[in-house]
Structures are given as C-alpha cells and as structure tokens.
Design a protein with these regions (language model features):
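GHKL/Histidine-kinase-like ATPase module
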Residues: 77, 104-105, 112-115, 119-193
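Short beta-strands and strand-coil junctions in structured, solvent-facing domains, enriched
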Residues: 9, 95-98, 118
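GHKL (Bergerat-fold) ATPase N-terminal catalytic module, capturing the glycine-rich phosphate-binding loop
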Residues: 1-92
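Short, exposed beta-strand "edge-strand" segments with a Pro/Gly-rich flavor and a Y/T-containing core
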Residues: 7-10, 67, 100, 125-134
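Short, polar/flexible loop-turn hinges at active-site or ligand-entry regions and domain interfaces
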Residues: 28-31, 94-102, 185
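Generic recognition of stable, solvent-exposed alpha-helical segments in well-folded globular domains
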Residues: 13, 17, 39, 46, ...
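Short, charged, solvent-exposed linker or helix-capping segments at domain edges/interfaces
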Residues: 63, 99-102, 175
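Residues forming anionic-ligand binding surfaces in small-molecule and nucleic-acid pockets
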Residues: 83-93, 171-180
C-alpha cells in the first residue's frame, strides 16, 4: 500500500522517531495535533515486512526503510523539487497476518467517516475522491434512518463537535461516537457524558 499527503511533511530530523519510537510525537509535542497518541505509523511499521517513510520539506527529503520495525536504510537528499508532504509505503507482514486482501468497502466507509470528522480533509483512493463540505453534518445526513423530527442540532467547540437529531419510526436509540478520529461503537467516557 502507498499513502501520500501534501502537507508540511514530517520534520525530516524527526522522521525515524516519528515512525519507530513509542512516546514520540502527538500529545504535548505538536500543538497542531493535540488529540492524537501518535502510535499509528509505528504500529504499521512494526507489523510490516517492508515499510518506507519519505518526508519532503523545504527542498530537502529523507527516506527511511524498515523491515519488521528494524531500520535498514536512511537516505538524505537536498535540492528536491518535489512538493512538501509525506509518503508511506508498506507491505503487511504475511508471517503475522497470513495471506490478506484489502476490503475496499470497509476502506470506503472509513474514508467517508474520516473526511466528515476531519473537516477540510480530502482523500483519494484508487481515483475516487472523498471530501465533505459540511463535516459531521454530512455524516449524519448520509446515515439518517427515517424522517427527522427536526433539523439536526449542531454544536461545535474547540475540541468537540456534537450533532443531535431524532427520527420518526426509529424504535431504538442510535449513537455514533468518535474520539480522536476513531469510531467508538462500544462507547467510552465521551459517550457517557
């Protein structure tokens, strides 16, 4: 699999730490992502037979290669014309996962949720564009079951967003909750509040 973003790029001097050292990045270290734990890339790295991370920033690039979490190569480049951002390539370790295949329908659902939860995010998967103009409101409207009794009530704060509505004909209570961009079907403290 290969993932490319066109953001600022992981700071190249911290690239190895960002993809391989637990407790680096995320909470407290980067004010622009205060709610993440920063374990995702590290987990993918350690569960991959091959893992490559490339960061391009300010005309410089760094590419690090790992096998099962062990660094095998570290390449630094200057004078790069490529746009800023990060590229992650990996192959899931078949010794851990056996033969596997990606379930596009699950990725489709996940990516639709992500662009709604992370307003402004745009994702392309196999030439299909994912984008949400209204964030969580789009997610709610796309998943309404029955006729709404009233327009959704939408509350938004610095670190929280809540939408509430009720529908005719629905015999059970349905709560969709997310924390740190992750769907939490079994709830948690945020859902009990």
């Amino acid at each position: 699999a290969s993932i490319r973003d066109y953001g600022r790029g992981i700071p190249i001097q911290h690239l190895v730490d960002a993809v391989s050292k637990i407790e680096t990045g995320g909470i407290g270290s980067q004010s622009h992502i205060p709610t993440t734990m920063a374990y995702g890339l590290k987990t993918v790295n350690f569960l991959s037979s091959e893992f490559v991370a490339r960061s391009v920033r300010d005309g410089k690039a760094r590419t690090v290669c790992f096998e099962r979490g062990i660094m095998k190569d570290d390449l630094w480049e200057t004078g790069i014309e490529e746009g800023s951002g990060t590229v992650i390539q990996f192959r899931a370790d078949e010794e851990i996962f056996g033969k596997y295949e990606y379930h596009i329908e699950l990725l489709d659902l996940y990516l639709r949720q992500q662009v709604c939860i992370n307003r402004g995010l745009e994702i392309t998967l196999n030439d299909k564009q994912y984008k949400s103009e209204n964030g969580l409101l789009d997610l709610i409207n796309d998943n309404l079951v029955g006729l709404p009794l009233y327009p959704p009530i939408h509350l938004r704060g610095e670190n929280i967003e809540v939408i509430i509505t009720h529908c005719l004909g629905l015999q059970q209570r349905v709560i969709h909750s997310f924390a740190n961009s992750n769907y939490t079907p079994r709830g948690g403290i945020h859902k009990k509040a």
